Regions:
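N-terminal helix-cap/turn-to-beta initiation motif at the start of protein domains
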Residues: 1-12, 107
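Central antiparallel beta-sheet cores of small beta-barrel/beta-sandwich binding domains
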Residues: 3, 15-103
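A short, Trp-centered hydrophobic/proline-enriched beta-strand micro-motif
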Residues: 10-16, 114
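Short, well-ordered, mixed-charge alpha-helical segments that flank or form enzyme active sites
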Residues: 81, 104, 122-126
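Beta-strand/loop substructures that line and gate deep hydrophobic ligand-binding cavities in soluble
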Residues: 111-118
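Edge beta-strand at a domain terminus
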Residues: 119-138
């Protein structure tokens, strides 16, 4: 994997989604992705509203030492940074951490990413946190 594998994320995005326990879209937000330090890091600055809960996050992503993906730290203002991972295979992007994994399909033109956050198999206790999410480039 190269640092360019996640370049599809560069730019500004609008996020919409629906919790699996909701009967209507209950997730909105924005995400902006930029390169830092001569391209060595990818920064994701996000804001989400999930129901009535507002979430702000800053994520720093870099190629991991094994060359098999990307490591990330997410800072959300609620304590120590959280460890996440990213990978991309063709038109599929994966973002995983804290017992949940997002698998998204990148549209042919790169303007939409549609997917679902699901609990990892060993984390059935996270089932109520599952949600569908669509990112549209703005």
């Amino acid at each position: 994997m190269t640092g360019n594998d996640l370049d599809v994320l560069l730019g500004a995005w609008e996020l919409t989604g629906r919790s699996h326990t909701a009967d209507h879209d209950d997730i909105t937000g924005t995400l902006t992705a930029t390169r830092l330090l001569d391209g060595g890091l990818l920064q994701l600055d996000g804001r989400m509203l999930v129901g009535n809960t507002e979430i702000h996050s800053l994520e720093l992503i870099w190629p991991d030492d094994t060359g098999s993906g990307f490591a990330a730290h997410v800072y959300s203002g609620s304590g120590a940074p959280l460890n996440y991972r990213w990978s991309r295979r063709g038109d599929t992007i994966v973002h995983a951490g804290l017992g949940m994994t997002y698998t998204g399909a990148i549209s042919t033109d790169g303007a939409t990413i549609t997917g679902t956050w699901l609990p990892d198999p060993d984390r059935p206790d996270m089932a109520e946190a599952a949600y569908d999410a669509t990112m549209r480039r703005i």
